[in-house]
Amino acid sequence: MRPLVAGVTEAGITALPNLVQERLAKADCIIAATRFHADLPSHAKILNWPIPFSNIFNILEEHSKQSLVILATGDPMWFGAGATLVRQLGAEGCEVIPAVSGLQLAAARLGWPMANCRIASIHGRPLEQLRSVLSPRARVLVIAQDGASPKAVATALCDWGYGAADMHVLANLGGSQEARFSGTASHWQHDRMPDFHIIGIACDDAAPAIGPVAPDSRFENDGKLTKRDVRASALAKLAPFPQAVLWDIGTGSGAVSIDFLRAAPGGRAYGIDRNSVQLDRATANAGMHGVSGFEPVTGDLADSPNKVLDNLPVPDAVFVGGGVSVEVVTLAQARLRPGGVLVAHAVTIESESVLISAWQQTGGDLTRIAVQHADPVGGFHGWRPLMPVTQWTWLKGSGENDRCGA
């Protein structure tokens, strides 16, 4: 039998719609948070939420021939259990009936239009992920981990330059114990909150802005870094979009992957490098920027390309920032999905010759990027050039000679 995943609010079991009430009355097994157990039908087997939640699939298998109802907070398809179950079981594998979510209630209490709010979750996720949704004038709603979350968020906001942000904790939304606590991040006075709450953050006008391409100074690196001006061009060509998959070959500090993920919600970037120290650095940079979806992949494409790549999903985009060779370029072209884009950079004459040859043979767009910055020269200033970068962009299509921008 298909399990039912029903949303429930702090108003409790009695506030559930008639359809859900009827299903509860006939259920053989009900999974719900402990605070709802006393109001559930006594004839059914009552289970707590499984920890870890992945154990839910063992319960589903055990009760596959029985009527099973899962009560989840708010809208189960919005950062909830429903999304996980549908992803695993398929849309036909379970039935979902949503309730008003805590996020919606919080927005209503604060008078923030939902369409203008950014949503983040730190429930079972790193606190650093919050950083990716912060910017001047942003209105952010945060799904908390527990009662200690607001204090941790306030501390993090101060560390990140958002100490002037207004914070609102809306606890037990929709229930008889609903409460609201407010203050600035830099003067947050509340150490412990009720476990069920939503955090609202209102960033001030003077909050730091990063932009779509992060400054070089935000990346720990040993010099193997695609500089910001050049990275901006690469990102424009890679064209990130929600849930896009990037292969970042020769990932170095991970800067291209990180900026790609910042522009691709739900995306994944696979940083491929033979140097595990570089991958550790890239992973740390991803965490510092608050992006999820970065996966380090250790391996040498020159020695065992299939072993390195065979378990990775087909990429929508490939960036080659290091280790340019005929073999790597050919491999990237073959592995790209139809319609995908390949962007490769070269700074040496040898690697540039590889890109020129690839451009001559398979088309695309060949560009040379030369950047100069004003630097002191004695008591004056002059233009100090960076090494020019040759950039080759190639779109994979059905023809034998694909030309970008043709």
Predicted regions and their residues:
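Conserved class I S-adenosyl-L-methionine
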Residues: Q243-G252
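Class I S-adenosyl-L-methionine
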Residues: M1-I97, Q104-L105, G266-A269, D273, ...
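A contiguous loop/helix-start segment that scaffolds small-molecule binding in enzyme catalytic cores
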Residues: R2-G7, I13-Q21, Q66-L68, A138-G223
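Active-site capping/gating segments
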Residues: F181-F196, S351, A358-D402
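Short alpha-helix immediately C-terminal to the canonical SAM-binding loop
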Residues: L279-D280, E352
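Class I SAM-dependent methyltransferase SAM-binding "motif I" and its flanking Rossmann-like core
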Residues: P3, T9-G12, G74-R137, A302-D303, ...
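Conserved SAM-binding loop of SAM-dependent methyltransferases across substrates and taxa
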Residues: S253-P265
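S-adenosylmethionine
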Residues: R274, E295-P376
